[in-house]
Each structure stands twice: as C-alpha cells, then as structure tokens.
A protein has these predicted regions:
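Binuclear metal-dependent phosphoesterase catalytic core
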Residues: 2-75, 79-86, 120, 124-158
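Solvent-exposed serine/threonine-rich low-complexity stretches and specific carbohydrate-binding patches
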Residues: 89-122
Length: 159
C-alpha cells in the first residue's frame, strides 16, 4: 500500500511563523518500521511525546462560542475522536472544516511583517478537516476527549 503525507516544516511556516498555514505546529514527522510494520506520527516541538490534541475552550475560537474545539495533530481519516461528559460516553465528536485558530491569531495579532506579506499569509491559510467540536450538555462539566489513531494508539485531553 502507498500512503502520501504532507509533512510540516520543523521551523513552522517559512521560518517565521510558529505554525504552518494548515495548522500543523512546528515539529518532526516520525516514521518507524518494525518487522515490516510501519507507524508514523507528528511530534510537536515543546510538547510531550504523546501530545496530539490542541484544545480550545468555549469562546476561544471565533464563530464557535458554544463549542469546545479540538485539533488532532497528525490526523488522517482512520482516526476516531470521541468524548465523555462527567464520565458518561457521548460518542463521536462532530468533525468540522475550519481555518486553524492559532495560525489566524498569529497572522492577525502577532506577525510583524509588512502589509503585503501579511496578506500573503492570510491567503495561505487553508480549510482543513482535522478539527472536531463538542457542546457540553451541562455547564462546567468534566470533559474527556479521546482520539485513537489508525494504529490503535489513544491520546487524551481533559477539561
């Protein structure tokens, strides 16, 4: 079988931005082969080896005021992303296409470039589908998000 991967630059976007325009954080793409079995993952710089989830609480993402939004770094269409609330399984999270909130924040508020270059950065942002969202049914409830990759590895975030 053949798999194609788009790999982010370890330096971020064009050596300047801490994040690529598709939302992939600075990092390295690790490919491992053992006895003919292949596995891979994206390792974010400055984060734990098993960190794959970036979570924004309600109100932190424009247009998603009522939602917790999750980015799954290294995602492909074989991942499962589920959640529980106060220990009760709520099933699969809703998958959404969006521009990366961190990249857009960087372009709008942190990048210190000329107007022409900033416009180029804005245009380089791409809609991606490695985002999921949930809406709590109980205010201030305890949320657990569990993402399982194609290899059966589980990654968890708690709010």
């Amino acid at each position: 079988q053949l798999y194609e991967h788009s790999v982010a630059q370890v330096s971020g976007n064009l050596w300047f931005a801490p994040i690529c325009s598709d939302g992939t954080p600075r990092g390295v793409f690790c490919i491992e082969e053992r006895n003919g079995e292949w596995q891979w993952h994206h390792r974010m710089l400055g984060r734990g080896a098993d960190d794959r989830l970036v979570v924004w609480r309600e109100g932190q993402v424009d247009g998603s005021d009522e939602y917790v939004v999750v980015k799954v770094v290294g995602w492909d269409d074989k991942w499962r992303v589920e959640w529980s609330e106060n220990g009760v399984s709520m099933g699969a999270m809703e998958q959404v296409e969006m521009y990366d909130p961190d990249y857009m924040h960087y372009v709008e508020y942190e990048a210190d470039y000329g107007k022409k270059y900033l416009e180029r950065l804005r245009r380089s942002a791409t809609l991606r589908s490695h985002y999921y969202r949930l809406r709590r049914t109980v205010e201030n409830s305890e949320i657990t998000i569990t993402a399982t990759d194609r290899f059966g590895r589980k990654f968890e975030a708690k709010l």
